[in-house]
């Protein structure tokens, strides 16, 4: 396995650990606009229903939070043109600290990204770093309805089970 593949696998495990520990419904390799020229795939999409007072009600789905993660192992991966699709209410770029520093030094604007997540020193969790271009007054980046987002999560999990 190449160093790039190993880095991607390590970052992916950390994303999966974070999604699972926060009790999100999630899937990896989630496709949108499948079969069209605009088809896009997001590395990880998670969903947590809105549950005030820990009670599920009819608005729990529409008011829930969708979180998108794009995993990039190195600069060539970042600039490859693949990925960097952010459709969630909250969006994260996940990368090694060295790539984050490169992007920061170059002043690369990260549109629609709330934070950059890098492995902690222990390598057991993800640590947030500021995204350049993030606007805290912007409440949500999501432009797709909850039913579509959830359906794509279901489809991605179904396709994975079939393979």
Predicted regions and their residues:
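Short, flexible loop/turn elements at secondary-structure junctions
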Residues: 30-32, 48, 72-75
């Amino acid at each position: 396995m190449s160093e790039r593949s190993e880095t991607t696998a390590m970052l992916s495990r950390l994303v999966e650990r974070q999604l699972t520990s926060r009790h999100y419904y999630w899937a990896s390799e989630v496709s949108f606009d499948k079969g069209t020229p605009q088809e896009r795939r997001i590395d990880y999409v998670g969903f947590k229903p809105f549950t005030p007072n820990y009670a599920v009600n009819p608005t729990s789905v529409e008011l829930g939070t969708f979180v998108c993660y794009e995993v990039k192992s190195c600069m060539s991966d970042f600039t490859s043109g693949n990925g960097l699709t952010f459709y969630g209410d909250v969006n994260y770029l996940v990368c090694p600290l060295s790539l984050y520093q490169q992007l920061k030094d170059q002043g690369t604007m990260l549109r629609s990204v709330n934070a950059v997540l890098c492995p902690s020193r222990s390598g057991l969790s993800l640590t947030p770093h500021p995204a350049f271009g993030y606007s805290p007054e912007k409440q949500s980046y999501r432009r797709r309805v909850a039913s579509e987002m959830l359906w794509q999560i279901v489809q991605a999990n179904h396709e994975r089970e079939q393979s």
